[in-house]
C-alpha cells in the first residue's frame, strides 16, 4: 500500500491571534479515502498549535515526540523544535518518517522537517504566515496577500486562504479543522 498524502495546513498570526487550519482530505493514489481527517491539534497544555502534512502514522509519532520535547524544555517552542529536528535527523528510525510539522505559539511560527530544518518564516505586513502540504503554496500566497491588503482578522485570513487553496489543489478540500490561540 502506498502512503497517503496530499494536504494543506496554514498558520496565520495577526494582532496577537494565532490560527492554524488544516483541510480534511486524505488521498491514497488517485482516490479520496477520507474527507474529514483532523490534521491540526493543540499541544503543550493548549499553548501550542500544530499541524502536519505527510504520512498520518508518522505525524502522530512526531506529535508525541514534540509534546515530550515541549515538556522537557519548559514549553519553549524554539528549543523544543530544534531538539526534535536534531533527533529526527539523526535517529535511524525517525529519519524514515515522511512528514512536515507546522507549529506555533503566540510568539513563534515554525516549520520542521526530517532533514533537520527549523524554519521561521519572514514576517509579512501586519502578521506572519506559513503553510505546508500540496496546497501550501496556494494558501500561503493568498494569506500573504490578505495580510498585506485587507483588515481581515487571523481566522478570516486563514479561512479565505484555505478556501482558495481548496479551489486550486486537487489534494485539498474545504472541510477545515481550525485551532486558535
Swiss-Prot record:
Active site (UniProt): 7
Catalytic reaction annotation: ATP-dependent cleavage of peptide bonds with broad specificity
Keyword terms: Allosteric enzyme, Cytoplasm, Hydrolase, Metal-binding, Protease, Sodium, Threonine protease
Regulation: Allosterically activated by HslU binding.
One annotated GO molecular function: metal ion binding
Keyword Hydrolase attached: yes
Gene (name only): hslV
One Gene Ontology term from the biological process aspect of the record: proteolysis involved in protein catabolic process
Annotated binding of Na(+), by residue: 166, 169, 172
Primary residence: cytoplasm
InterPro entries for this protein: ATP-dep_Prtase_HsIV_su, Ntn_hydrolases_N, Proteasome_sua/b, Proteasome_suB-type
EC number(s) given by UniProt: 3.4.25.2
Role description: Protease subunit of a proteasome-like degradation complex believed to be a general protein degrading machinery.
NCBIfam families attached to this UniProt entry: ATP_dep_HslV, PRK05456.1
Quaternary assembly: A double ring-shaped homohexamer of HslV is capped on each side by a ring-shaped HslU homohexamer. The assembly of the HslU/HslV complex is dependent on binding of ATP.
Covalent S-S links between cysteines: none
GO cellular component: HslUV protease complex; proteasome core complex
Name of the protein in its database record: ATP-dependent protease subunit HslV
Localization terms from the record: Cytoplasm
Pfam families linked to this entry: Proteasome (PF00227)
Family as reported in the entry's similarity comment: Belongs to the peptidase T1B family. HslV subfamily.
HAMAP family referenced in this protein's UniProt entry, alphabetically: HslV (MF_00248)
Catalytic class of the enzyme: hydrolase
Originating organism: Anaeromyxobacter sp. (strain K)
